[in-house]
Amino acid sequence: MMVQRLGPISPPASQVSTACKQISPSLPRAVNAANLNRPPSDTRSVILQESLVSTTLSLTESQSALSVKQEWSQSYRAFPSLSSSHSSQNGTDLGDLLSLPPGTPVSGNSVSNSLPPYLFGMENSHSPYPSPRHSATRAHSTRSKKRALSLSPLSDGIGIDFNTIIRTSPTSLVAYINGPRASPANLSPQSEVYGHFLGVRGSCIPQSCAVASGQKGILVASGGHTLPGYGEDGTLEYERMQQLEHGGLQPGPVNNMVLQPGLPGQDGQTANMLKTERLEEFPASALDLPSALPLPLPPPQGPPPPYHAHPHLHHPELLPHTQSLSLAQTGLEEDGEMEDSGGKHCCRWIDCSALYDQQEELVRHIEKVHIDQRKGEDFTCFWTGCPRRYKPFNARYKLLIHMRVHSGEKPNKCTFEGCKKAFSRLENLKIHLRSHTGEKPYLCQHPGCQKAFSNSSDRAKHQRTHLDTKPYACQIPGCTKRYTDPSSLRKHVKAHSSREQQARKKLRSSTELHPDLLTDCLAVQPLQPATSPGDAADHTVGHSPGPGPGPGPGAELYSAPIFASNHSTRSGTAAGAGPPPHPVSHPSPGHNVQGSPHNPSSQLPPLTAVDAGAERFAPPTPSPHHISPGRVPAPPSLLQRAQAPHSQQPPGSLLKPYQPETNSSFQPNGIHVHGFYGQLQTFCPPHYPDSQRTVPPSGSCSMVPSFEDCLVPTSMGQAGFDVFHRAFSTHSGITVYDLPSASSSLFGESLRSGPEDPTFLQLSAVDRCPSQLSSVYTEG
């Protein structure tokens, strides 16, 4: 909440002191403009009085500073001296607000001109102004707006935290709600004045309304009972407010506990008279009891009821007849008739609501008045809510027996000792007696069945099982079960529901993907080595991080052309690979050092066609389906151009395992890509039949080496990267994006100490160092 500050409208300190002395000469201490002393109060705390000052002023209508100053100047001259108990609790620029009598308006647009005296800590209830009616004429109330900010001079320089005060004393505003209605001059509506503080919009701001008695009720702080006519919502509101103010309002004297003054009644009584009469009934010792203890005639303690409960206030002489609201509502049913309670039995025949103390009297009344008085052969039940829906009986005795259901008469009582059951029909009693005697006179009539039953209905159910007559069929789709009695059908339906719940649980558990399943799907699976004589070679050769002059004799051969990764950038270390399982079109093997993108001085020759008789299989275009965080596919032709030069082979002959160039003269022109996003580890070729896989390759064919083998670790400038990017993008259609690099030797140094597993494809360096990403290769 924002508090607006006025300009310099405060009078000098001498005027403040003079005004305060004129208002209250008996003040115990002198009032100065800088720091007003706070005399102790025996009845209320300082915080509560501060809240009264601040919240009262914050509810006034906005007006100019001049009008506020003039209004307060007039108020000073009008008030006589008060007792010291009315003295200030807050130092202000214009004196003490609490020196004013309760109920005095503080501005021309004041919306609260009747403050209860107990909130000011008044020990003497016989104040010079016992009623706010004396000062009500100066409160020219208008239709106030919601959340009006205070423009009174007291808001300047006080430094009061309104939020803290309102939270400390949540019911300080509720105490003086109906003030402006204290005289006929102030009957203007005041809706939504305090609603923004109370949390309920306009719930506690009653409008001026006429009451039949002409007298408004009052509230006296005492026990936890409710005045009659307050309504259920009023009781709930009162209990809630009482909990809030349990620690805020101290148990003070009885003299200051009238919260709501009233209009003058028809008999000339005023709220002040009622206050004096009610206070005489409560001694001081009774008020010290907890609120939970019931008092003889205790009106409720706390704030007045909400707005919707005010029109239901009763005359003051009804106060001794207070009773609990729940008791007034109990026993009433929807039709407004009293149920059988306290020995009363009600007749619900149409247009009849007779009450009887004894059940026999009600039965006699139904028979003599409602059945025997019917003319002709009309034996229809007209009981309210009867399920027969006015279907007549064909005999009088049947109607009488039926009426026992409504009246509750059960004349047929069990004669066995200890059994207290009674029945309205004699047949039901006979069936019950068979349960005591064990008699089962109803035998199954189906040949060969010896079952017997105590009643005919059970026998009929059993006989339907023999006749295969099962009228009670299951209505669930897909179920063809039928039953002879409805009870069995109900059990079956319950079993259906339990089975459906179990099925839903199983389906839910099966559809939910476990995190481990997703991890297993994304895991890199090892490639199975091809069955070739080279598999018997030593698997330990070729994995050493140190450089070597040639390929290891035991280089692994895989079933598809792959780019082996050993997680170590080496100068001259070879990763051997076997021939591809199917013919793949490659560029002419006439490439040399000058024909590779490592040397920008020469031009790359175009791709050469494979032999005319050979099947043409173009390398698959990289697609998003082949891209994974650890693998970035690329055409073999591109990688062959980017690799180190190798010896020329005649077309149509198989190439030997790749021999990387280890000449040191080549290294200055080598390219080292920082943080290449995943080494190109595997290439996913299209699936071909096994027959094509066994065909020996024809035409020019070469095995693509590992891409990291051609990335020799060396230093190069930005020009070398530009040349490589241009050559890479021009001939492959793959765009190269440069990103900031975090390391200069990703392949060589960061992963040199990592463990190696010859049976698995190792993930790239990005898997371990994701922050060192420098180049991302995407499709052009």
From Swiss-Prot:
Biased composition (Basic and acidic residues): 497-512
Biased composition (Polar residues): 80-92, 106-115, 593-605
InterPro entries per the UniProt record, alphabetical: GLI-like, Znf-C2H2_ZIC1-5/GLI1-3-like, Znf_C2H2_sf, Znf_C2H2_type
Gene Ontology cellular component terms for the protein in this record: nucleus
Compositionally skewed regions (Basic residues) per UniProt: 135-148
Bias kind Low complexity: ranges: 567-577
A molecular function (GO) term: RNA polymerase II transcription regulatory region sequence-specific DNA binding
UniProt-annotated location(s): Nucleus
Biological process annotations from GO: negative regulation of transcription by RNA polymerase II; positive regulation of transcription by RNA polymerase II; transcription by RNA polymerase II
Motif window: Bipartite nuclear localization signal: 490-506
First and last residues of each zinc finger (C2H2-type): 345-370, 379-406, 412-436, 442-466, 472-496
Keyword flag Transmembrane: no
Residue ranges of the region described as Disordered: 80-148, 290-315, 485-512, 527-670
Biased composition, class Pro residues, residue ranges: 293-308
UniProt family annotation: Belongs to the GLI C2H2-type zinc-finger protein family.
PANTHER family found in the cross-reference section: TRANSCRIPTIONAL ACTIVATOR CUBITUS INTERRUPTUS (PTHR45718), ZINC FINGER PROTEIN GLIS3 (PTHR45718:SF1)
Functional summary from the UniProt entry: Acts both as a repressor and activator of transcription. Binds to the consensus sequence 5'-GACCACCCAC-3'.
Protein name: Zinc finger protein GLIS3
Organism: Mus musculus
Classification lineage: Eukaryota, Metazoa, Chordata, Craniata, Vertebrata
